[in-house]
């Protein structure tokens, strides 16, 4: 009897373990964040600043020059050799580089195919209409903020570009706001952007501006991952994203 009871006990334990394993829900896919380029700015309050984004195309082997405000290049396809002073770096698809205000960058497309890249800029009003790249580059403006970025404070700021991928069927994240500001560019997939309770689909090529104080949410209801770029500015030592609405000060 004892042997039979022990056998039944072992069978029961095994069945329970199998049932528990079958009921275990796999963890949802994680959000993937990749830092593309970043720098630190000692101040952002000397003059009002704007976001601007342009797309640039260089024919195979063609050269151009970039001399503009603080900004970050992001290579979409092809390759670009970027030379700043004595330093040279070749950008492949998905790579980026910060170019500081006042620096002149020489750009050369690879010989195999055209070079296509984005140039995200943090510019004063005096540079808004200034071409980011010289001929023979084909430059197309994608976006500029109508008014200066609000809420910038004295002190240092982080300026960065991050590539983020939301997994398929990701529910909207909790309401949040930017401590500084950000400009999004949707690379692939379609996300749901919710502001004031209204959700709007945002597909490839969309640009979305998030100034300080804008409470919003992001999700991905689609069956494919959604990848986007976030050109972001936030106070040094403060998270780029903060929960809920900004705390009102007296």
Enumerate the language-model features and the residues they cover.
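Ligand-binding loop in jelly-roll beta-barrel domains
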Residues: 102-128, 192, 212-239
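Short acidic-glycine-tyrosine-enriched beta hairpin
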Residues: 59, 85-102, 196-214
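N-terminal, post-signal-peptide region of Sec/Tat-exported proteins
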Residues: 45-89
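Glycine- and acidic-residue-biased ligand/ion/polar-headgroup-sensing regions
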Residues: 68-85, 179-197
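Bacterial N-terminal signal peptides
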Residues: 7-17
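A short, N-terminal "cap"/entry segment at the start of jelly-roll beta-barrel domains
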Residues: 21-55, 89-93, 97-100, 112-160, ...
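Short histidine-centered beta-strand/loop micro-motifs
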Residues: 62-68, 108-110, 172-177, 219-221
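Positively charged n-region of N-terminal signal peptides that target proteins for export
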Residues: 1-5
